[in-house]
Amino acid sequence: MRLPPNFKCADVICDFCGYLAQVKTVNTPQIESAPKTILGAAWRPQKERMDAAIYLFLVLVNPHKTSHSIFYLSADLQQPEMFRPRTPLSSTARRAGWQGFCYELDRVLGGLVRIR
């Protein structure tokens, strides 16, 4: 079941067991392997939850949306080093000071499992 928009650090929840997961999509012409880096969301909430068992699903979609892959990375294989904070937005930005992060998936490529 999808969680409400802007729910921090999770996108879906199993209505049976309560399992939380985060879903990221990436448009790419290459669906056979995961990208080395993908954009995350807000850094502070993610940093606060890095010790929580939130699992990452990565869905890759090609530009024509004719095929896709699903990659899974369990929480126990996620490492603090794979979360790279981005530079905070400048003081002139609409959301000045907001800071995002990137997933550095090349640090955990061996842990990603392609399930589709």
Predicted features and spans:
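Nucleic-acid endonuclease domains
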Residues: 1-20, 24-116
